[in-house]
Amino acid sequence: MAVALAEAGHRVAVNYYERASRAEELCADLRARGFVAQPFQADVRDEPDVARMVAEVEAALGAVEIVVVNATGHQPLLSIEQQTWQSYLDQLEFFVKSPLLLVQAVLPSMRARGFGRVIQIGSEVVELGNPRFANYVAAKGAQLGQTRSWARELAASGITVNLVAPGWIPTERAFSATEAEKAAYAQAVPMQRMGVPEEVGRVVAFLASDDASFITGQKLSVNGGNTLE
């Protein structure tokens, strides 16, 4: 997503929590290609940390016009008997609290300029209802509701709010499945394959562009038709 936004001409701030080397490597690669990119450390579940990060981003790169909410944490499979309220809160911290803190931090300047793009990264699991995953599915469902409510509230201020719902995309961080598991998933997808990160990035860049100026409150599924509606 950072690459797609940079290629679309945006200055990119890459947030990281612990993996500084990966964020710095990504930004260095983008700068080598002539783009503007800089890493910023923060725990997006922590309000003071988010406020500090946004202030640092604005000082280094200018006003924040686009926010892509993509932070996530550990996602263990747990039966109903194994799940606790804390296991739900752990997911809500990433998918409801962190979007709230980020949007609250950038909203004053977005309102003042009459422009903003908020792009949440959701998941197809809300439609699929994956078993042993209710805490994650519930948090992602809440994130979708949050997106739609914000879209109505902020539309008159020139701020769009949308959600991209990817399927199972192989990424460096989260992809530890077996070949059999990957093959089984791909076979169930109408397009008979898994997606790639670049396909999600292009949709994010589209929603950030002027071409999407009249699109708000929408969920765009990037999953090869796996949740045909």
PLM feature spans:
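Canonical Rossmann dinucleotide-binding motif of NAD(H)/NADP(H)-dependent dehydrogenases/reductases
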Residues: 1-13
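Short, small/polar-rich loop/turn modules that mediate ligand/substrate recognition or access, typified
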Residues: 62, 155, 160, 215-217, ...
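Catalytic Tyr-X3-Lys loop
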Residues: 65, 81-100, 115, 119, ...
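Catalytic loop of short-chain dehydrogenase/reductase
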Residues: 73-74, 87, 91, 119-142, ...
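Short C-terminal tail/terminal secondary-structure segment
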Residues: 77, 128, 187-188, 193, ...
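Substrate-binding pocket helix/loop in short-chain dehydrogenase/reductase
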Residues: 78-80, 84-92, 174, 181, ...
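A short, exposed helix-loop element centered on a Lys and neighboring polar residues
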Residues: 103-104, 148
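Alpha-helical segment proximal to the catalytic Tyr-Lys
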Residues: 108, 152-156, 213
